[in-house]
Every structure is written in C-alpha cells, then in structure tokens.
C-alpha cells in the first residue's frame, strides 16, 4: 500500500469497507486566536469535521477533531500546519475504522 493512497481507499484495498476516521488531538495555550486558526485549516479545504470538542482549563486548551475520509498525506500536512500556529504546543494524529 502506497503512503500516498488515501486512507478510505486503503480500507477498501484490504477488503474492509468501514469508513476511516482521522483524529487530531491538539494541546495549546488557552488563547482566543488558536481555535479559529485550527478550524481554518479544515475550512479553507472545504472540509467539515464530524466532531469537534474543545476544553479550556486554566491556561491549557485541548482540542479534539475527527474527520472521515482524509488521506494520510493531507492529514500529515494539516498536522504540520497546526504545529506552526502560535500557541499550539502538541499535535497528535491517529486513524481508526468506524464500525457500522
């Protein structure tokens, strides 16, 4: 399987037709400009996450985003862009197959 193959296509290639969900976990300083800059990375690509959850606790902002059908290359690129946002401290990604 090529690393440039979209995750959804990879799921079909190995016989599993369940959708692939990419998850981003972002830890940042709790500053007003962080959330719009993170969501902009999806919006300017015409992507709408299936799930967005954020929690501010003191000076820490935690953001969890889930989006279906995002290719590995684009996922990695968006994660690199997130890491360049001022105030973002950590970005982790994972992908899973949704059942159903």
Protein language model features and the residues they cover:
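A generic structural motif
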Residues: 59-68
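Regulatory modules associated with amino-acid/nitrogen control
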Residues: 1-44, 50-60, 73-100
């Amino acid at each position: 399987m090529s690393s440039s193959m979209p995750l959804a296509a990879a799921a079909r290639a190995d016989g599993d037709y369940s959708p692939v969900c990419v998850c981003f976990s972002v830890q940042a300083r709790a500053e007003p400009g962080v959330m719009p800059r993170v969501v902009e990375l999806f919006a300017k690509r015409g992507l709408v996450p299936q799930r967005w959850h954020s929690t501010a606790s003191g000076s820490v902002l935690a953001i969890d985003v889930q989006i279906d059908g995002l290719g590995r290359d684009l996922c990695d690129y968006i994660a690199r862009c997130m890491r360049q946002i001022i105030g973002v401290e950590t970005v982790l990604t994972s992908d899973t197959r949704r059942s159903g």
